[in-house]
């Protein structure tokens, strides 16, 4: 996968290119990241990249000409088929389904805004899609862009150490992840669930699915509203609810 970055602070993306899963992907040639700074496309000695908004008000906007020229340079480098994305609070909210959808693109250009944003006409003429990582304000689009790159890169074949890792991530099936355990077997009196030590892979799969369903029901119940549960999933969720109610009753009785 090839990803182009339009940013006033391209050095921030060393967190992606030099470390962790994405750093290994870059090193192994599975992910290529290039960056363009609008500051390199300015024509004044101060390398100005911001301008006042029409209509007044606080803050500045990114200057149109350097930004457009940077986008055009990235498009030229990408060639045919690159999708241009603007990271914006007004965009479609990123979720696992959206990540999976974006991962089908071989070329992405990510435009990172700064100040109060960018000229609406640049969005209309240069941007294919707007994406947001949440309903809150950040100082720029770099962190959202890094979030998008990290999540999308997990779908690139060969990036993760285990082929099933991406499909078993939280939200991959619309559910939260199940609890995980490693050594020691007993930690301050808390034991690993016996089923995980049993070696019975069918029972382990069933336990993990039940816990995943139950955790989603407890913490993010709205996610279940959008799912058509299978017969097995519905049965396991009912079991979890019954066991949870029994535990709550036992806890209340001890209180």
From Swiss-Prot:
Main location group: cytoplasm
Origin species: Escherichia fergusonii (strain ATCC 35469 / DSM 13698 / CCUG 18766 / IAM 14443 / JCM 21226 / LMG 7866 / NBRC 102419 / NCTC 12128 / CDC 0568-73)
Keywords, sorted A to Z: Cytoplasm, Methyltransferase, S-adenosyl-L-methionine, Transferase, tRNA processing
GO molecular function, one term: tRNA (guanine(37)-N1)-methyltransferase activity
Protein name in UniProt: tRNA (guanine-N(1)-)-methyltransferase
Residues that span the membrane, as ranges: none
Role: Specifically methylates guanosine-37 in various tRNAs.
Top-level class of the enzyme under EC nomenclature: transferase
GO cellular component labels: cytosol
Keyword Kinase on entry: no
Gene (name only): trmD
């Amino acid at each position: 996968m090839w990803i182009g970055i339009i940013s006033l602070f391209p050095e921030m993306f060393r967190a992606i290119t030099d470390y962790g899963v994405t750093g290994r992907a870059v090193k192994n040639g599975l992910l290529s990241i290039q960056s363009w700074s609008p500051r390199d496309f300015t024509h004044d000695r101060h390398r100005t990249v911001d301008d006042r908004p029409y209509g007044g008000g606080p803050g500045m906007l990114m200057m149109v000409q350097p930004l457009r020229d940077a986008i055009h340079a990235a498009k030229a480098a990408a060639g045919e088929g690159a999708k241009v994305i603007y990271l914006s609070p007004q965009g479609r909210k990123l979720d696992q389904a959206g990540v999976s959808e974006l991962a089908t693109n071989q070329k992405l250009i990510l435009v990172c805004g700064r100040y109060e944003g960018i000229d609406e006409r640049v969005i209309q003429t240069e941007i294919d899609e707007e994406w947001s990582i949440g309903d809150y304000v950040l100082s720029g689009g770099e962190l959202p862009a890094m979030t998008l790159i990290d999540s999308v890169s997990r779908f690139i074949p060969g990036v993760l150490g285990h082929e099933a890792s991406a499909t078993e991530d939280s939200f991959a099936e619309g559910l939260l992840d199940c609890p995980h355990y490693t050594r020691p077997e007993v930690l301050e009196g808390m034991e690993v669930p016996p089923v995980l030590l049993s070696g019975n892979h069918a029972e382990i799969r069933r336990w993990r699915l039940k816990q995943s369903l139950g955790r989603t029901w407890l913490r993010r119940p709205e996610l279940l509203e959008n799912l058509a549960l299978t017969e097995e999933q519905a049965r396991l969720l009912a079991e979890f609810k019954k066991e949870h109610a029994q535990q709550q009753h036992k806890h209340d009785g001890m209180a």
